[in-house]
Design a protein with these regions (language model features):
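Activation on beta-sandwich/Ig-like modules and their edge loops
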Residues: 19-183
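Positively charged n-region of N-terminal signal peptides that target proteins for export
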Residues: 1-6
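Bacterial N-terminal signal peptides
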Residues: 7-18
Length: 183
């Protein structure tokens, strides 16, 4: 008997996504580089919507200190990386410069709350991650980042994330399960 998507989500303790929510989400976090002095921490944003988002004045109010420049946009389906040190990130992971912003002030911890706000101060997304289970443990000191399994999942839940590979660059979204299907 094949396992249906709903059964798979239930086994993982993840709520089934009803539909892809439009908007910009915190999609990937690299918070514990190996070695610790590498200065290649980053937060990746993904635009899940069908229109270009103008990020001018948007900012992180928790975790890191970074405000997006007035002319910053993110196309539908696009990605942006906010890096601790853009030059070091680019050298380490061959990340294309046009997708990397920064530097930000602060350091990501082994447990942090990241809050993304628009220019009016409204909360757009929030992730309160940790370095232990149910969060991906390979992201804690092993050099990996953690990435959202599907952009419509609640990214404030550890079960919605997985450890990423070592090549870190904006690419096709990680979609392990299609949204909008029922079992």
């Amino acid at each position: 008997m094949p396992i249906r998507p709903l059964q798979f989500f239930a086994a993982l303790g993840i709520a089934w996504p009803s539909a892809v929510a439009a908007g910009v989400v915190i999609n990937e976090i690299h918070y514990d580089a190996d070695p610790k002095t590498a200065a290649v921490e980053f937060v990746e944003l993904h635009n899940t919507g069908d229109r270009t988002e103008h990020l001018g004045g948007w900012y992180f109010s928790n975790g890191i200190d970074f405000t997006f420049a007035a002319n910053t946009t993110l196309k539908p389906g696009g990605y942006l990386v906010v890096a601790e040190n853009p030059a070091k990130l680019g050298a380490e992971f061959r990340t294309p410069k046009q997708f990397v912003l920064g530097p930000y002030i602060g350091r990501l911890s082994n447990g942090e709350t990241l809050t993304l706000r628009n220019a009016a101060g409204e909360q757009l997304d929030r992730v309160n991650y940790d370095s232990g289970f149910p969060w991906p443990t390979a992201a804690s000191g092993a050099g990996s980042s953690m990435e959202l399994i599907h952009p419509s999942l609640d990214n404030d839940l550890g079960g919605s994330w997985r450890s990423a590979g070592m090549l870190i660059e904006p690419s096709e979204p990680v979609v392990l399960l299609a949204a909008g299907r029922s079992g």
